[in-house]
Amino acid sequence: MLNGQKIELTPEQYQEVCNAVTSKKKTPFDRKEKDETYYFIDNDGIVDSVKDRGWVADDLRYGNANYCSNKELMVRRADYEALERVLWRFSEENGGGGAYFICYDKKIGDWAIVKTPAYILLLGPTFCSKAIALRAIEVAKEWFRENDLKPEDVFF
């Protein structure tokens, strides 16, 4: 029905209408066709590219979300993961995880510390005390300087 009138469609037209209604917008994370290029974070943390051949390595990268058609997006992810590992190591070397985590406030352009209740579990590194979290902010700032990056270059 369209505007109250019944419209007869051929099977081909019906299929086209169904495809138009259910078509999914492609994202950078969709699986590529054979021989199309995608980007991934290599063992050394560097973003590399390869053509999808349908090999086991392609399946593994796609399955664990290490597969993206947008190089810039993957570079940001690689930088984010590197910073997160640096902060995780710092946390482990300084008392381990805890109720404190650090965050960057884009609105004010500065870092903050947030304390969470013990029953809240966060993704990413946490810190055992406010003092250690303050030191972690300095570690993060140093990492940004050493890599000639700003928080806006890394965080999504």
Where do the PLM segments sit?
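Structural boundary micro-motifs
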Residues: 1-156
